[in-house]
């Protein structure tokens, strides 16, 4: 099998994002495209990546499905060598992945494929009471503000306003009205780890808008949609026990 990307920089950025959560993943390649679904070692976060077949200039698949077990740290280092004008060809040869980059010169790398024993995963079918579409730059700023004062922040829907706030000895708060963000929600509140949110919102830099789905003390799903690509993160809530 052989697949080709004319611009591998987006793939490189996504691999770097996923590697912040998990190191070893299975790439699944089938007639629809390329996908990854993985859970971080702490079972707190989940990521799904899908790159549609239409994103590739060449997509020759001999079997119904190919599975590549990959160490993302190794793949990340190789993809960083791609330039702005590079094209990328991925070709499996037995237990290795041949990676060819072409621009002024043709460069070849080989990546050893690994056997990953974990079971195949599916994204859970979650129900949410809140859906917020927000400017990605505003989301990044709000999360970074909260990181200054605490290690967790709350996503709040209150009277059709969306609030991101953190409270400890100090506090931070960003409030967005329905005029600034697209809100489809009832009043609710849930708290999430800033350590993980900071990893997620790095992905928001890839697109202008980010979609947040959540509910009372409920997992968060963050959706990033770019042409021919989907990137989804799920984060468990931080539920504090009552004394």
Model-derived segments and spans:
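DNA polymerase sliding clamps and clamp-related checkpoint/processivity subunits
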Residues: 1-19, 26-148, 156-243
């Amino acid at each position: 099998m052989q697949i080709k990307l004319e611009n591998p920089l987006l793939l490189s950025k996504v691999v770097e994002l996923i590697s912040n959560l998990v190191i070893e993943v299975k790439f699944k390649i089938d007639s629809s495209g390329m996908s990854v679904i993985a859970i971080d070692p702490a079972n707190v976060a989940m990521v799904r990546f899908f790159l549609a077949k239409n994103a590739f200039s060449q997509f020759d698949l001999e079997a119904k499905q190919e599975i590549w077990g990959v160490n993302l740290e190794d793949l990340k280092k190789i993809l960083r060598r791609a330039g702005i004008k590079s094209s990328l060809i991925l070709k499996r040869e037995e237990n290795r992945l041949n990676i060819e980059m072409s621009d002024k010169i043709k460069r070849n790398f080989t990546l050893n494929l690994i056997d990953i024993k974990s079971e195949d995963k599916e994204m859970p079918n979650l129900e949410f009471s809140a859906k917020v579409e927000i400017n990605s730059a505003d989301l990044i700023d709000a999360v970074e503000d909260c990181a200054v004062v605490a290690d967790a922040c709350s996503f709040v829907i209150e009277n059709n306003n969306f609030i991101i706030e953190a409270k400890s000895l100090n506090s931070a708060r960003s409030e967005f009205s329905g005029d600034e963000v697209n809100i489809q929600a009832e009043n609710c509140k849930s708290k999430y780890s800033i350590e993980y949110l900071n990893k997620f919102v790095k992905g928001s830099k890839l697109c202008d808008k980010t979609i947040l789905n959540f509910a009372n003390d409920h997992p968060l799903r963050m959706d990033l949609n770019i042409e021919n690509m989907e990137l989804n993160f799920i984060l468990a809530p931080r539920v504090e026990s009552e004394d």
